[in-house]
Amino acid sequence: MIKNAFLFLALILTALWTQFSISAERQVECWVVGVSDGDTLTCLLPTKKQFKVRLQEIDAPEKGQPFGKKAKQYLSLLVFKQNVTLSVSGYDRYQRILATVYLQEQNINLEMVKNGMAWVYPQFAKNPLYFQAQDFAQQQKIG
């Protein structure tokens, strides 16, 4: 009986540790297994745990909106089936992980804005590089 209770407690603690381990780490490496739209992707950890990632500081058109399909395709071209590093800042209201996505040294969030596939999310953007990239894309009439 005590052995079963100990095993049950160990399972609960393991489940809780897995749930919170992503937010506890600032940097997470994962494999991109899906792209929902121009600012959301699905990652797979080496432990086979999947989770949604929302690219922070930017916003992209949704599937049914103009350029929505193009934004999704561009993000897919950049990161689908790639190992990426997430710089995690927390969770959004839909419990997706908020992160800046890096492919090697390339800031993917910034690339989306620079190439006119996303715009700056002014309520949440802190990095001035995003605003500069958006100005550049608008001046060049990209996207």
Regions found by a protein language model. Give the residues of each.
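Small beta-barrel nucleic-acid-binding modules, primarily SNase/OB-fold domains
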Residues: 2-143
